[in-house]
Amino acid sequence: MSLLTEVETYVLSIVPSGPLKAEIAQRLEDVFAGKNTDLEALMEWLKTRPILSPLTKGILGFVFTLTVPSERGLQRRRFVQNALNGNGDPNNMDRAVKLYKKLKREITFHGAKEVALSYSTGALASCMGLIYNRMGTVTTEVAFGLVCATCEQIADSQHRSHRQMATITNPLIRHENRMVLASTTAKAMEQMAGSSEQAAEAMEVASQARQMVQAMRTIGTHPNSSTGLRDNLLENLQAYQNRMGVQMQRFK
């Protein structure tokens, strides 16, 4: 895997799924391919994106700044600086300085990532802030190692919370989670169906599922009533794809 592919993989792992994720992936591809060279416009676009946490925006802003060539005097952006200040905790800043000194001795992406992984997310963010604010310099490879270590830690904690969701026994939360998943699956089906005639059937199934979820939420239903809702949808989608000759096993 090339360095930029690895960076893209780690960064996208912390962006919530949805249309915005696809948009960010495209922006990253363009930046890494040297197609997008207007850093100021890129940062303005990033600043106004909804849904993303300040830290995710800060990391993306850091990656864009590392990659897009810009004039030396280009102003640093406040929203990135605020996100990468380690919550203003002096302990994070102390650890960030120690980490920075170690990173100065590293020359490879993987070496930097290994060193960084033993620090907390707050210290890693602060260290990125040091580099972003030009208070320290490291090679681009080392900076990318720091980025990927931070993303790995964030993705780990997100994964833990997803696992917790899977093991929650509260029937009301599980019921709502099934309905949310059915709704997002239906939306994805509608987007994938396109405008072909064969797609009408898939659109119909998706539309019915969304109406059903809406009705269940409006009138209030027994927590078990949503069992199998998403699985039925996925079976329908799979059957539709097989007829269309499309294989998207990974969708599940």
Swiss-Prot record:
**Where is this protein found?**
Virion membrane; Host nucleus
Q: Where is this motif: Nuclear localization signal?
A: 101-105
Superkingdom of origin organism: Viruses
Q: Name one GO biological process term.
A: viral budding from plasma membrane
Q: By its UniProt entry, which InterPro entries does this protein fall under?
A: Flu_matrix_M1, Flu_matrix_M1_C, Flu_matrix_M1_N, Flu_matrix_M1_N_sub1, Flu_matrix_M1_N_sub2, INFV_M1
A GO MF label: structural constituent of virion
- Where do the segments described as RNP-binding lie? 165-252
Checking Gene3D superfamilies in the record gives: 1.10.10.180, 1.20.91.10
The protein's matches in Pfam families, at most eight in alphabetical order, are given as: Flu_M1, Flu_M1_C
Pull one GO CC term from this UniProt entry: host cell nucleus
Reply yes or no: does the keyword Zinc apply. Answer: no
Q: Note whether Membrane occurs among the keywords.
A: yes
Q: For the region Membrane-binding, give the residue spans.
A: 1-164
| Keywords of the record | Host nucleus, Membrane, RNA-binding, Viral matrix protein, Virion
Q: How does it sit in the membrane?
A: Peripheral membrane protein
Q: What does this protein do?
A: Plays critical roles in virus replication, from virus entry and uncoating to assembly and budding of the virus particle. M1 binding to ribonucleocapsids (RNPs) in nucleus seems to inhibit viral transcription. Interaction of viral NEP with M1-RNP is thought to promote nuclear export of the complex, which is targeted to the virion assembly site at the apical plasma membrane in polarized epithelial cells. Interactions with NA and HA may bring M1, a non-raft-associated protein, into lipid rafts. Forms a continuous shell on the inner side of the lipid bilayer in virion, where it binds the RNP. Determines the virion's shape: spherical or filamentous. Clinical isolates of influenza are characterized by the presence of significant proportion of filamentous virions, whereas after multiple passage on eggs or cell culture, virions have only spherical morphology. Filamentous virions are thought to be important to infect neighboring cells, and spherical virions more suited to spread through aerosol between hosts organisms.
Task: Spell out the subunit comment.
Answer: Homodimer and homomultimer. Interacts with NEP. Binds ribonucleocapsid by both interacting with genomic RNA and NP protein. May interact with HA and NA. Cannot bind NP without genomic RNA.
**HAMAP family named among the record's database cross-references:** INFV_M1 (MF_04068)
What more does the entry say? Answer: Most abundant protein in virion. When expressed alone can form virus-like particles in transfected cells.
User: Family assignment?
Assistant: Belongs to the influenza viruses Matrix protein M1 family.
Name of the protein in its database record:
Matrix protein 1
The gene for this chain is M
